[in-house]
Amino acid sequence: MPELPPDLQRILRESFFIRATMTRRKSGTPRTVELTFRWDGGSKIVLSGYPGKRDWVANMAANPDVTMHTVEFDPWYDIPARARVVRDRKERLPHLLAYIEHWAGRPGFPRGRVMFFLGAVKLNRRLHLPWWGPFWFARRIFDKMPCVDLTFTGEPVLRATGGPPPLSEPREGRP
C-alpha cells in the first residue's frame, strides 16, 4: 500500500477515537461504532478498550472487511481495512501495552501512575518473571481486553460530505 497522505498521518497520530462500519454477524446489516485505537505509523491500527466481551469484536471476527472513518479532525477520511482478532497472549500483550501507552497520553489522564505501572509490566515480561502479585491482576485485565488488528487494504478516500457517518442506534438490550 502506498504511503498515507500527510494530513491523514497527522490525524491518525493525534487521534484517540475512530469509527468503524462493519457488518453485523447475525443480521448482516451495517453497524457503525466509535472505538479507541492506536496507529502503528504504517498501514495498521489496533482497536481495544475496556475489558469484557464486545459485539464489535464478534462482528469483525465473523465479517473482517470493515471501513474505518476518521472523526476527530478534518479533512474526513474513509479507509478500507481487514480485521483480525488477536487471541494469543504473547502476540496481544505488546499491542495492548502500546495501546494503553497511547491512551495514557490523552489530556487529563493520570499519566505518571499508568506509565510507572506499564514500565513495571514491561520489565516483568522482559525478565520472563511469573505473573505473580499485582502482575497476576494485570494479566487478568489484559486477557479480557479486546484486541483487533486492522490492516488497511485500499486507498484512503477523502469524504465528500462533512464529518464521519453517524453512529448506529443501539439495539434492544445492548449498549
State where each predicted segment sits.
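A short secondary-structure junction signal
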Residues: T32, A160-G163
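Short, conserved active-site entrance elements at the starts or edges of catalytic domains
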Residues: M1-P30, L167-P175
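A broad, low-specificity signal for short, low-complexity segments enriched in glycine/proline
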Residues: M1, P5-Q9, G28-T32, W39-K44, ...
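Extracellular/periplasmic catalytic domains that process cell-envelope and extracellular macromolecules
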Residues: I11, R38-W39, I141-F142
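Short, structured beta-strand-loop surface elements
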Residues: P51-P134, F142-K144, T151-P156, G163
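Short beta-strand segments
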Residues: S15-Y50, V66, D78-P80
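Conserved hydrophobic/aromatic beta-strand scaffold that supports enzyme active sites
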Residues: T32, C147-D149
